[in-house]
C-alpha cells in the first residue's frame, strides 16, 4: 500500500520548496516487485493483461503528453475547455488540491491559476503553513494553498513539481510518487476544504470491479465535505473512438509498445522484444470500451526466471494493455452515489465529447 504522506521519505535532488516522497518508481526494486505481482495477477491469464500504469515511465509520460496534442485525440482539448470555463466553480473554497495521476501537471495549470495565482500575494509555503486558513468548509482570501500531485513516474513528477514551484512561488507543492490505486491515507491537507482531482478519463481504465475498489478506497480516505472531480469520456461514434487511440502519426503505437520495453527493463525476462509486437486499438461494443493490445507478429516465448513462469503467444495473439470505458453521465453519477459521493455538478464541453462530475463526500 502507498500512503499519501508528502514531506517524508526520499528527498534527493529536490528543488527548493519541493519534497518528493518516493514510494514506487519504475527503476526501484519496489517497482520490480510491483510489476512482478501485476504479471502474476494478469499476464498468465487468458487473455494476458498488464495494468496501464506501466505505460508511464519518463518516456511514456512524454509520449502521452504528445498524444494529448494530436488532432485525433479530442479528450484533452474537450476536458481543458470545461476546466477553463468552470475553474472558479471547481476550486472555490479549497485550500488543498490533490491530483491523482498528475503526470506533467500540464492540464492542472488552468485550475492552479485560479487556485493559487502565479506570484499572488499572501500565499503560504512550507509544511504547516496556514496563513489565515479558516476551518474546513471555507477559507479566507489569503489562506495558504497546497498542491499534492501523485504519480507513478518519479522523474516526470519531480520535474513537474520543480516547474510549479517556480511558476507559483507561493504554492506549497508536495509531490508523492506512488500507486494511486493503493493509497491508505489519510489525505494530506491544510485546515480547510480538500479537492481531489482524477482527470483525463482515467476512471475508464478500470474494470467494473477495479472501479468499485478504487471508489471505495477514495471514500475510505476522504472526509465528509471533501470534494472529488472526475473526468470521463462520453459514448460516441466507434470510428472516432478508434481513431483517438490509433493516430495516423503512430504516437499511440509507440506509447503502447513502450510498455514492452518497460517490462523487459524492469523484470528479469528473456524473449520479450518490442519488435515482435504491433499496436492495435479496437472497440468493444458490449463493454462500451476501447481496448488497446500489443499483438504478436510472430510466435514468441517469454521466460520469467524469477517468477518461475513462461508465456507463449502465437502470431496474432495479444496482450491487453489498456481498456478505456466510455460513460453516460447518469450511470457514472449513480455509481458514485452508491459509494457515498453526492453529485454537486456535471459539466460537458460544447461538443458533448467529454464530461466532468464534481461530487462531495456525504
Regions found by a protein language model. Give the residues of each.
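Conserved SAM-binding loop of SAM-dependent methyltransferases across substrates and taxa
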Residues: 104-119
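N-terminal auxiliary segments of SAM/dcSAM-dependent transferases
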Residues: 2-53, 61
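Substrate-binding/catalytic lobe of Class I Rossmann-like enzymes that use SAM or dcSAM, i.e.
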Residues: 240-325, 329, 333-339
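Class I SAM-dependent methyltransferase Rossmann-like catalytic core
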Residues: 47-89
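A short SAM/SAH-binding and catalytic strip from SAM-dependent methyltransferases
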Residues: 193-212
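Conserved beta-strand signature within the Rossmann-like core of class I S-adenosyl-L-methionine
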Residues: 221-235
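Conserved class I S-adenosyl-L-methionine
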Residues: 94-103
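A short glycine-rich, Lys/Arg-flanked "PGG" loop and its adjoining helix->strand segment in the class I
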Residues: 212-224
Amino acid at each position: 500500500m502507498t500512503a499519501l504522506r508528502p514531506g517524508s521519505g526520499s528527498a534527493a535532488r529536490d528543488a527548493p520548496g519541493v519534497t518528493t516522497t518516493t514510494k514506487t518508481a519504475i527503476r526501484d526494486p519496489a517497482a520490480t516487485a510491483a510489476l512482478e505481482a501485476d504479471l502474476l495477477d494478469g499476464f498468465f491469464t487468458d487473455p494476458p493483461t498488464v495494468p496501464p500504469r506501466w505505460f508511464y515511465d519518463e518516456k511514456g509520460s512524454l509520449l502521452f503528453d504528445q498524444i494529448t496534442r494530436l488532432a485525433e485525440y479530442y479528450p484533452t482539448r474537450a476536458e481543458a475547455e470545461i476546466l477553463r470555463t468552470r475553474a472558479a466553480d471547481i476550486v472555490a473554497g479549497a485550500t488543498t488540491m490533490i491530483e491523482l495521476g498528475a503526470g506533467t501537471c500540464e492540464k492542472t495549470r488552468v485550475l492552479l491559476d485560479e487556485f493559487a495565482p502565479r506570484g499572488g500575494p499572501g500565499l503560504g509555503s512550507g509544511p504547516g503553513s496556514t496563513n489565515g486558513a479558516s476551518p474546513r468548509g471555507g477559507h479566507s482570501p489569503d489562506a495558504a494553498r497546497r498542491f499534492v500531485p501523485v504519480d507513478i513516474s518519479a522523474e516526470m513528477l519531480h520535474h513537474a513539481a520543480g516547474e510549479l514551484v517556480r511558476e507559483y512561488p507561493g504554492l506549497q507543492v508536495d509531490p508523492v510518487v506512488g500507486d494511486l490505486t493503493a493509497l491508505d491515507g489519510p489525505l494530506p491537507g491544510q485546515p480547510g476544504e480538500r479537492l481531489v482531482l482524477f482527470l483525463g478519463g482515467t476512471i475508464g481504465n478500470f474494470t467494473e470491479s477495479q472501479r468499485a475498489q478504487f471508489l471505495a478506497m477514495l471514500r475510505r480516505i476522504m472526509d465528509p465535505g471533501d470534494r472529488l472531480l472526475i473526468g470521463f469520456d462520453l459514448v460516441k461514434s466507434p470510428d472516432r473512438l478508434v481513431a483517438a487511440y490509433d493516430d495516423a502519426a503512430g504516437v499511440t503505437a509507440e506509447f503502447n509498445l513502450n510498455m514492452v520495453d518497460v517490462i523487459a527493463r524492469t523484470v528479469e525476462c528473456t524473449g520479450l522484444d518490442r519488435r515482435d509486437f504491433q499496436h492495435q486499438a479496437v472497440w468493444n461494443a458490449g463493454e462500451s470500451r476501447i481496448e488497446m493490445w500489443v499483438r504478436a507478429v510472430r510466435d514468441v516465448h517469454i521466460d520469467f526466471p524469477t517468477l518461475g513462469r513462461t508465456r507463449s503467444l502465437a502470431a496474432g495473439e495479444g496482450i491487453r494493455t489498456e481498456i478505456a470505458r466510455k460513460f453516460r453521465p447518469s450511470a457514472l453519477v449513480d455509481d458514485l452515489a452508491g459509494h457515498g459521493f453526492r453529485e454537486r455538478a456535471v459539466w460537458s464541453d460544447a461538443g458533448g465529447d467529454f464530461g466532468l462530475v464534481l461530487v462531495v463526500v456525504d
